[in-house]
């Protein structure tokens, strides 16, 4: 009986904490706050809507990823897309359920999956297909015929020479500037952020804030999310760091979002869609901690006029290598989160803080729109095709059936014609 009573007390205490957090958020809700401004067009600021404007991202991310494969000499039998799928993806249920193939033929984009493809990853494949098609139809990009493998999972696949052919992924493992996976990074198209988000500086709450699902796994005691949660609950650090419920942020936001998709992603165990930033921007500092992979919400935080504090991590998205610590954001060691927040709030630091905030917003405004992401994808496909030699991909796509829908068995049966890349000449 005593054990049951003790358990009941614990449950009631947890319920009280959750209700308290929800009440605090609703009290400070910005859903009706007219001073939160979404800015679609910023006079004097540029968008990277040409390949020339995107060269900084190509130089830091795309070209290095492609060069890994350009420098390799492989035996002809080891280079086929079908061989890559057959030898590795079919031998791991976990990898297979997140593996898709994207085909572009005569300007039309197709997504093909295995029969047991996980529904949780469907939004990531569908968003690539639909967004590339939208910008292709709008005349903003011109996609070459191609066939490529897309990894929709939260982790890279091409570790320790795992990939014999380039594989498009959203996440890469990079430590001390050295890649530990060979995935070719491409943009995540499923969570668009197009607008800057501003809030009056003199009305910002002088705290660091992080969005988090209240029932999410925060990892071991030494992880960034776990430590920030612990600081937020502490008597002293709690005055400087606050945790907001991501689900409540989404429910009360002015920004309409697909909440059912967020629920599916959260329940399925993949990183859930990040909440809109219109409540987070009300704080002086916004904090980003990775989950078991890169936090997709970092892009939205960079759009705000709050300083971004990013927990140190080895997970990278396609644009991370173009960001600079101390220029666009402040990187912090999770165990020193409280000290970083205090330092950034000091009066003497505000000139530097404002400069970093503007640099971050300019970066996000210029490089992270959906149109810029679609252009990056177009360039990635072009560079990928070059690896196989002139005309190779066009001939490969021509082998696919034209009188019915393309299926995975058609990809597995592709003829692997010789190419200059296979012969080690590229």
Model feature map: region roles:
Residues 25-268, 274-275, 400-402, 414-421:
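Secretory-pathway glycan-assembly enzymes, especially type II membrane glycosyltransferases
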Residues 14-30:
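N-terminal signal peptide
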Residues 6, 15, 142, 200, ...:
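A generic structural signal for short, solvent-exposed coil/turn residues
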Residues 274-402, 406, 410-411, 417, ...:
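Catalytic binding pocket for nucleotide-activated donors in carbohydrate/polymer assembly enzymes
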Residues 1-12:
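Classical eukaryotic N-terminal signal peptides for Sec-dependent ER targeting/secretion
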Residues 5, 144, 202-205, 240, ...:
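Short, well-ordered loop/turn elements at secondary-structure boundaries
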């Amino acid at each position: 009986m005593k054990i049951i009573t003790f358990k009941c007390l614990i449950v009631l205490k947890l319920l009280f904490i959750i209700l308290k957090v929800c009440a605090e958020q609703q009290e400070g809700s910005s859903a009706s706050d007219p001073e939160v401004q979404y800015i679609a067009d910023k006079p004097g600021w540029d968008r990277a809507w040409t390949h020339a404007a995107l060269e900084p991202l190509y130089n830091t991310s795309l070209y290095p990823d492609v060069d890994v494969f350009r420098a390799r000499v492989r035996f002809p039998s080891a280079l086929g897309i079908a061989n890559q799928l057959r030898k590795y993806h079919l031998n791991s249920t976990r990898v297979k359920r997140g593996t898709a193939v994207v085909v572009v033929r005569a300007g039309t984009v197709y997504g093909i999956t295995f029969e047991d493809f996980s529904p949780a990853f469907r939004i990531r494949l569908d968003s690539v297909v639909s967004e590339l098609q939208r910008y292709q139809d709008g005349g903003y990009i011109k996609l070459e015929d191609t066939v490529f493998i897309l990894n929709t999972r939260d982790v890279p696949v091409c570790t320790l020479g795992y990939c014999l052919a380039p594989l498009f992924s959203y996440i890469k493992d990079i430590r001390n500037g050295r890649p530990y996976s060979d995935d070719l990074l491409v943009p995540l198209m499923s969570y668009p952020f197009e607008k800057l988000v501003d809030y009056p500086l003199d009305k910002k709450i002088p705290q660091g804030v992080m969005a988090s699902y209240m029932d999410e796994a925060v990892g071991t005691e030494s992880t960034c999310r776990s430590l920030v949660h612990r600081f937020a609950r502490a008597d002293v650090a709690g005055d400087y760091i606050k945790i907001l419920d991501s689900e409540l942020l989404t429910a009360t936001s002015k920004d309409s979002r697909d909440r059912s998709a967020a629920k599916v992603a959260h329940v399925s165990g993949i990183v859930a869609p990040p909440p809109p930033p219109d409540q987070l921007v009300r704080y002086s500092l916004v904090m980003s901690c990775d989950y078991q992979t890169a936090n997709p919400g970092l892009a939205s935080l960079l759009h705000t006029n709050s300083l971004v504090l990013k927990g140190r991590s080895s997970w990278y998205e396609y644009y991370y290598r173009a960001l600079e610590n101390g220029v666009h954001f402040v990187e912090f060691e999770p165990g020193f989160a409280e000290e970083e927040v205090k330092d950034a709030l000091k009066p003497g630091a505000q000139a530097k803080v404002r400069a970093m905030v503007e640099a971050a917003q300019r970066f996000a405004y210029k490089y992270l729109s959906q149109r810029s992401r679609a252009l990056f994808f177009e360039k990635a496909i072009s560079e990928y095709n070059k690896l196989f030699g002139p005309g190779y991909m066009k001939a490969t796509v021509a082998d696919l059936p034209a009188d019915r829908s393309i299926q995975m068995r058609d990809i597995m049966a592709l003829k692997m014609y010789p190419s200059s890349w296979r012969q080690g000449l590229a």
